[in-house]
């Protein structure tokens, strides 16, 4: 028995930002975004369509932490009249911040207590969110959780509530044209990881796998060309659509081992999330092969009959994009690597992985690099 559910209404297509006024519908709104000129310009376009924002939060940082989020929630709580909807304009960090603000309308302390102890759920708020992603990869526009970082304690939390699904996702590939090469690659690899991680996942189902196969196949086929032709609108549309399908895939499964490994790497070494969660994919794939008929069938739809050769091709794909699959290139020695894997296998996301630690250890020496 399986179930699949996703309540987000998706509007996809070049120029679809023009529909933002219909989504806000004369409600007072809070805009959450980055303090960068390109986002100022898009914010002005939103204001022309939906009216001026009641509050603009521009202090979003990569990997939003407790300090930044506490300030954002305080601003939101102090705004009168209270915003009735949040417009999240940006990448994954903006989406995460917007979801925390949506839940922290009474202040960040309620969110903090819920994250740390699972307490005070009744104190969390549920302001609706309209998600406007400007990167192709986060998937957060169609999921119900946010990644929150407690940098003081060196911990990563996941804020997960059904009310955190955005009501609408407005996905306009035109907003992604200006993304630089490194960001284009890292965000697309995050989407690739979402897709593959939903396949080698205990929570996988035929619908999530269908979305994942499409997404992974498109990213593998299109990303190398896009990396060399960043202004190609057709390729941007393909990658944005693939990232959306990857989001729909893992929205019902969550991620697995590669993501579980990645979080301490980002915290300790500053490795961008999309790279941290993708460089280990060949190793994780090798440890998943042969564990589940359904998983193998899904992977064969992407990589062909010989899955070992497919893992090698995945490795070559990453290296050709300039992404090393060697842990040492991220400042990780053998001892830390084994500690990361042991910890990841027992983590919340690692427990979704269909393979065993013994299989992972066996795969460590495989591959061509």
Regions found by a protein language model. Name each.
Residues 1-85:
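ATP/NTP phosphate-donor binding region
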Residues 67-74, 78-174:
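Glycine/threonine-rich beta-strand-loop-alpha-helix active-site module
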Residues 137, 244-277, 347-349:
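Glycine-rich phosphate/pyrophosphate-binding beta-alpha loops
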Residues 145-253, 355:
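Carboxylate- and glycine-rich phosphate/diphosphate-binding segment that chelates Mg2+/Mn2+
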Residues 163, 300-369:
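C-terminal charged capping/lid subdomain of soluble metabolic enzymes
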Residues 264, 268-326:
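Active-site pocket-lining segment
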